[in-house]
């Protein structure tokens, strides 16, 4: 099959890229070795977070936030997005000092979306919080969406614009022939002058085929969800010195994460819950919300992510293979960035440059 662009990876990054290219008239094929959103894209915490981003990611996160607030214009769905804000809690003076330094750093870069709040404002926003906390850092425009709803919306919109999608299509070999990339899979050959690697935890397999392996480490962040409860909290909650992502969904369940990792068998694409680490996550919640001690956990899961050594992604052109572009390694915080990453790749492919700064994300930072 011949196309303008072949995209490897049927997650949010792959479909966002396909969508933005299709909006500008490109013929795209998306190849997914499993089912759409089987790994990171469909099972993450759904955080729409500008708060506490790596400085290099801030311009992208701010641009992505603007898109999420009008996401229906892009994908004909609101993706169940909600924006109650997100707050990092300071439990003591040392935590507050850390948050003050962070706020000063963000302001020095010219941004004002992260706001220090004192104890009174914190308890006005989160009255159920344990009484020992002293303040926080908030981004009032942050929130969350439903990952599988978002993935479905991006996929459906892309396909409505003519994007061809094939699941259960594992890429076995990539080679250049003339001006095209020939992508061999167990379901046939696909050809295009442009190849995009959005293969997530398996992106290094594709990058290695192209002669530019990267130090990508697969990992499987765990999540817990509770029984339904009466609503008692609006903002998404994190902590300055603990691993925590805590939110109450509109159906009353609590979604609890924090980057504790499951045991992962990448070869067999299976995960096993690490109950000791889940217990740490549960104790963190109880330290901040002790009234939840009798609440039942009803489900746990893990999704396979790609982690980079510097915890920021690879976005941009290949350093060795003309016509190849990468978007992977989002290190468990790529969901919010997905609309703008697709836009960036479309700009790089079609215009040769992007309106957003992408140099920090170059794959060449890992070149030997």
Spell out what each predicted region is.
Residues 22-42:
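Glycine-rich FAD pyrophosphate-binding loop
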Residues 137-193:
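Helical element adjacent to the flavin cofactor pocket in flavoenzyme catalytic cores
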Residues 287-368:
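C-terminal catalytic lobe of FAD-dependent flavoproteins
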Residues 228-323:
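Active-site lid/adjacent beta-loop-alpha segment flanking the redox-cofactor pocket in flavoenzymes
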Residues 77-88, 113-119, 123-161, 262-267, ...:
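Helix-loop-beta segment of a Rossmann-like dinucleotide-binding subdomain
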Residues 38, 189-234:
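Central helical "cap/lid" subdomain
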Residues 3-29:
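N-terminal Rossmann-like FAD-binding beta1-loop-alpha1 element of flavoenzymes
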Residues 46-125, 243, 284-285:
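Dinucleotide-binding Rossmann-like beta1-alpha1 core, especially the glycine-rich loop
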């Amino acid at each position: 099959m011949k196309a303008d662009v072949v995209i490897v990876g049927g997650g949010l990054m792959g479909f966002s890229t396909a969508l933005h290219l299709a909006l500008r008239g490109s013929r795209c094929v998306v190849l997914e070795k499993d089912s759409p959103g089987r790994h990171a894209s469909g099972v993450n915490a759904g955080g729409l977070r500008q708060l506490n981003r790596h400085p290099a990611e801030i311009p992208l996160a701010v641009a992505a936030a603007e898109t999420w607030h009008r996401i229906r214009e892009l994908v004909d769905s609101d993706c169940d997005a909600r924006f109650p804000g997100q707050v990092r809690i300071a439990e003591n003076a040392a935590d507050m000092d850390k948050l003050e330094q962070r706020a000063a750093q963000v302001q020095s870069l010219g941004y004002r979306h992260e706001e220090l709040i004192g104890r009174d404002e914190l308890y006005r926003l989160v009255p159920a919080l344990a009484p020992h906390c002293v303040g926080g850092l908030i981004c009032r425009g942050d929130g969350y969406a439903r990952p599988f709803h978002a993935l479905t919306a991006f996929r459906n919109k892309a396909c409505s614009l003519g994007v061809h999608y094939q699941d259960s299509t594992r890429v076995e070999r990539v080679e250049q022939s003339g001006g095209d990339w020939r992508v061999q899979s167990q379901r046939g050959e696909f050809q295009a002058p442009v190849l995009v690697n959005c293969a997530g935890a398996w992106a290094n397999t594709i990058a290695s085929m192209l002669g530019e392996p990267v130090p990508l480490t697969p990992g499987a962040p765990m999540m817990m969800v509770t029984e339904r409860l009466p609503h008692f909290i609006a903002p998404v909650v994190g902590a300055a010195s603990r691993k925590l992502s805590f939110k109450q969904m509109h159906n009353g369940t609590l979604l609890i994460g924090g980057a504790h990792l499951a045991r992962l068998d990448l070869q067999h694409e299976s995960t096993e819950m690490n109950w000791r680490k889940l217990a740490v996550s549960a104790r963190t919640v109880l330290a901040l919300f002790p009234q939840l001690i009798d609440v039942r956990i009803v489900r746990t899961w893990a999704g396979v992510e790609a982690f980079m050594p510097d915890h920021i992604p690879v976005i941009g052109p290949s350093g060795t293979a003309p016509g190849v572009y990468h978007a992977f390694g989002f290190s468990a915080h790529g969901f919010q960035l997905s609309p703008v990453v697709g836009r960036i790749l479309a700009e790089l492919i079609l215009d040769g440059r992007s309106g957003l700064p992408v140099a920090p994300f170059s794959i060449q930072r890992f070149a030997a």
